[in-house]
UniProtKB/Swiss-Prot annotation:
Residues 17-88 form the PAS domain. SMART domains: cNMP, PAC. The keyword Phosphoprotein applies. Phosphorylated on serine and threonine residues. Phosphorylation by PKA inhibits ion conduction. The gene is Kcnh2. A motif (Selectivity filter) lies at residues 626-631. It comes from Rattus norvegicus. The lineage of its organism: Eukaryota, Metazoa, Chordata, Craniata, Vertebrata. Pore-forming (alpha) subunit of voltage-gated inwardly rectifying potassium channel. Characterized by unusual gating kinetics by producing relatively small outward currents during membrane depolarization and large inward currents during subsequent repolarization which reflect a rapid inactivation during depolarization and quick recovery from inactivation but slow deactivation (closing) during repolarization. Channel properties are modulated by cAMP and subunit assembly. Residues 235-286, 873-992, 1015-1043, 1126-1163 are annotated as: Disordered. Glycans are attached at residue 600. Signal peptide: none annotated. This is Voltage-gated inwardly rectifying potassium channel KCNH2.
Amino acid sequence: MPVRRGHVAPQNTFLDTIIRKFEGQSRKFIIANARVENCAVIYCNDGFCELCGYSRAEVMQRPCTCDFLHGPRTQRRAAAQIAQALLGAEERKVEIAFYRKDGSCFLCLVDVVPVKNEDGAVIMFILNFEVVMEKDMVGSPAHDTNHRGPSTSWLASGRAKTFRLKLPALLALTARESPMRTGSTGSPGAPGAVVVDVDLTPAAPSSESLALDEVSAMDNHVAGLGPAEERRALVGPASASPVASIPGPHPSPRAQSLNPDASGSSCSLARTRSRESCASVRRASSADDIEAMRAGALPLPPRHASTGAMHPLRSGLLNSTSDSDLVRYRTISKIPQITLNFVDLKGDPFLASPTSDREIIAPKIKERTHNVTEKVTQVLSLGADVLPEYKLQAPRIHRWTILHYSPFKAVWDWLILLLVIYTAVFTPYSAAFLLKETEDGSQAPDCGYACQPLAVVDLLVDIMFIVDILINFRTTYVNANEEVVSHPGRIAVHYFKGWFLIDMVAAIPFDLLIFGSGSEELIGLLKTARLLRLVRVARKLDRYSEYGAAVLFLLMCTFALIAHWLACIWYAIGNMEQPHMDSHIGWLHNLGDQIGKPYNSSGLGGPSIKDKYVTALYFTFSSLTSVGFGNVSPNTNSEKIFSICVMLIGSLMYASIFGNVSAIIQRLYSGTARYHTQMLRVREFIRFHQIPNPLRQRLEEYFQHAWSYTNGIDMNAVLKGFPECLQADICLHLNRSLLQHCKPFRGATKGCLRALAMKFKTTHAPPGDTLVHAGDLLTALYFISRGSIEILRGDVVVAILGKNDIFGEPLNLYARPGKSNGDVRALTYCDLHKIHRDDLLEVLDMYPEFSDHFWSSLEITFNLRDTNMIPGSPSSAELESGFNRQRKRKLSFRRRTDKDTEQPGEVSALGQGPARVGPGPSCRGQPGGPWGESPSSGPSSPESSEDEGPGRSSSPLRLVPFSSPRPPGDSPGGEPLTEDGEKSSDTCNPLSGAFSGVSNIFSFWGDSRGRQYQELPRCPAPAPSLLNIPLSSPGRRSRGDVESRLDALQRQLNRLETRLSADMATVLQLLQRQMTLVPPAYSAVTTPGPGPTSTSPLLPVGPVPTLTLDSLSQVSQFVAFEELPAGAPELPQDGPTRRLSLPGQLGALTSQPLHRHGSDPGS
């Protein structure tokens, strides 16, 4: 695979940097967005949650003024100082008394620090909290919870005496109060002076309690002294985006009760003077600047409004806490300043005003100066680092540092590789062959060892290796977190722990150090220490170990290198035995005799070096491959022992390497083949769709990183080959960190955890990727396990989430998934666990005993559901019933009597039917009502229409049967029904609309002797309108279509009225005689086939008076309207008039069985 480049994509490491700096010091801090209302909290660490007792979900989106921590002993002056720092986007350090969730009070030191983006604009605030002491004073009220109203005990005590906290920082300024009091105007209305009352009575409002609108007005007054542009810049942020004048999402009842005149603000804040304003303290960006400031600290005179930005005593260093300010240091010109004098006119021996003026500079001026406390600088400045900026930052590379994947480093590595190969070849050769020649005096006696050409090359190689060691001290590396480390100190430590010792030993020129000592054997042995450089080959060539061709080439080179080393050893053995051997039987003597260059009696002469090396290499290759011919044979015992070792090595190498070359290549090449296949597909996709270069780079980088993260393993494909029990165990192991440390999953049974683990999916996101877009359906719940993300609404950051945070929507509150109200974008490389809502609900349904615990302990850090898209945020029943109503609200009638209630013994037949609404025994066997029609073909029930109001008129005719009294819990048919009733009526509605009144006439025919229908009194109200169709609502038919339908209905009603008037006498006779007769065939549209006998229950009725033509005319209208098809614009106008044919003797029919006519819709 290619070299590991690490995380080289630009990342927003703001949150990680803050956590790294603060968490190591056990800091407690929150991060607030300066661009949203009330400077809402978008992040809080675990230390702050432990300090205040609130969970992260309870703190998120609250005002960063921490009004929910206020209590009876919270100083309003201190709260005003925090608000002033937030309004002025300045750094401040305030001591204030806060209350925990359990009611305990503690004195806290708050550091307010602004954070800038790359443009220099303040977009966030960091508030660091440091506990000074636990407040336990005499007469202190009992522990009081912050979320309830103030008790009468401490309210009464607060009115009795004034509470004054002796702040050490403010007491130190008492000596400087006199010049300010004498030099200031004594009236509250003096220009530039603001009266601040020190009385801290918590109950009654006082002049000390200045709301934010008063502060804005005060800014207006002072800003009038400067240019118009400065005045607008000063007043704009305070008036447009107030910090405390608008209640936050979690208003504190106690804070509102403490300050009733704050215009709805959750806490009454005022701009007051902080203790750090007494002298101008220069901003330091590192610890070195702090020391320099300490050494050169001098008392400064009081400032005035005319003091400019380039004061002679002001330091030339830019007061900066971010990289952008340091870059713009030389471009800053003179900055106009506006000052306010905060004067205390009440004589107070404990609290005093400072002697200097407080500078308030317009927040729009980016290159402004601030007064920075030394504590803030120590907290935020560690070494040479400065406060990070909230922006995408590429990995910071230290100066004079070489990237490990840079082209220079790649060329240098190849050069070092060639030098290592040279060392591996020539070091054994020179130790075995050349030293003996030097010892024999083949070279000139006055020419030293340095005159040899190979010695000069060895010297150059040694120098190159020493230079490589120095380069390794400046080369970046990738740590375990896939981060590129460029800090020289960390690089040196990493190199010392790794390969430094081996590289150092291999780079020592031993032959030069012991040159002239006369021990050539020792030199030859020490020269072999350079073979340690072969470890470099293993390191450099490891990245090519997955390529089949490279592996084959490396195996061949390894085999040749081992043969070369063995040849040098073979020559060394023969050369060592040759002078001490009386009988010339060694392989060197045999070689000299064979080629005609024998050794003389003095041992000189013999074959040349070339002949010796080639013969030795020939013998080792033939022995390693077991194909030796015997022309070079071992004769002495030493030679035979070495030959045995060579044969053993050769057999192992031949069997393990050459015999399995194909298997090795296939095994090593399988992963690489998959990688290159996938990469080829990605590149073909990029080429085919012409993806632009920035997006192409992101695709390739994500693929490479995802491959290194998963190693090309498809987890789903792997798990499919195992049984479900083993899959659950594997998933439980992979998600063990989430299931063990996340609070909602604690207490779950092993089976529940296994079921949940099977449903979780892991998502890996690079920086800059958007996980959820605004408007997307929220189909899953997300748990962050690594990295940080931001949530944006438009371009405004509303939350920054980190490890162990949860975002999504509360699934138990909504039956249908909602839509996201913002974009979720990754700031760094993130790992998230997500579970789909259907899967989660399915598991919780299987384990109901765990469901209640899960929903009660689940704290979603940020709720992404957009409640504005659905007006009123309806419940699931409203959503489902509303969805059904949209399909059925085609046509509706106004059928309601003047009386809202009916008699106790009556059941409405034209309303919803019986008082019990919903499916019952009488409607389960009827698919679409009593006449077999589908629910969507006829008009909807009165409850299914939202258009009908209290003033709708009613039908003049109502036919109701007498029945038993209703149960107490049932509602009458004329009263509005609940949402459940609406939902049930949509499912099964046998007596739907006005049509049900006519259907009841034929439903109760049979052996019901003595049962009569009665006519209700007619309503004096005007005739009702038949249709209630809002033409202007979306999705309705056009006006012309509705008018054409009305004309067709009118014609149909006229025909039906004519038919019914002709058949009325016969119908009344049938009803009075209570005989089973065939109902009249009045349908003029379609004649259905014969159907099953009706099984509707028969209800007793009372006597019915004679029906009039007008009353039955109303019934005919409803019948005609019910028979109208849903999609037919016109109805048939002509057709034969069908009349009822009665037998001659009606009395004989009473004993005959019921035979329904084929045209009867109820058949």
